[in-house]
Design a protein with these regions (language model features):
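Conserved phosphate-binding/catalytic region of the ribokinase-like
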Residues: 87-188
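Ribokinase/PfkB-type carbohydrate-kinase core domain
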Residues: 1-121
């Protein structure tokens, strides 16, 4: 459920969470200063805990979150705001701001592109369903597919097609019930 008037989660809220049981933490980058403080807390208490950040829109101070992330997921709109109309140059520019992170940019019907920490470029095509039934949550489903693949120890070459297939499956059904099926156990 999406509710626009819900207040943003703050670092004060985040301080009450015990990070020990978590395998991964994911943020949507909305408030740069709050998200940066939360990521800093993760890095101070659980250096081993992977942390991903989705960056959809340009927002004041958002680039500050890049330094602490393990995985950065950008939108094509964000790349376009920075005057990039192709994914590779955008990813290379973002690499300058986030040397430690794997970088992903979604590119609509072309799928998604990535630049891993070894500077290897990866691509997965989109996997559109035969019939589009519901796109609500497809982006979050893509993110979940990436995180799922990474948690299972897969690299970007496997994670990108896994996430693209999962997002395509989501668009081909209404809601999230039963999403994945075989794809949940067989990435790529």
């Amino acid at each position: 459920m999406h509710y626009r008037d819900l207040p943003e989660y703050t670092d004060d809220d985040f301080q009450h969470i015990d990070l020990i049981p978590f395998d991964w933490v994911h943020f949507e980058a909305r408030d740069g200063s709050e998200t940066t403080r939360m990521i800093r807390r993760i890095r101070e208490s659980r250096l081993d805990l992977p942390c991903s950040v989705e960056v959809e829109k340009p927002r004041p101070g958002i680039e500050a979150v890049f330094a602490g992330a393990t995985l950065l997921i950008f939108s094509r709109a964000y790349a376009g705001h920075h005057e990039f109309d192709t994914p590779h140059p955008f990813l290379l520019r973002m690499r300058e701001q986030a040397l430690q992170a794997d970088l992903i940019v979604t590119w609509g019907n072309e799928g998604a592109y990535g630049l891993d920490r070894r500077r290897a470029i990866h691509h997965s095509p989109a996997y559109p369903p035969i019939e589009v039934k519901d796109t609500l949550g497809a982006g979050d489903t893509f993110n979940a597919g990436l995180i799922d693949a990474y948690i299972r120890g897969l690299g970007m070459a496997e994670a990108l097609p896994h996430a693209c297939r999962l997002a395509g499956n989501k668009c081909g059904q209404i809601g999230l019930e039963g999403l994945g099926g075989d794809i949940a156990t067989k990435p790529g």
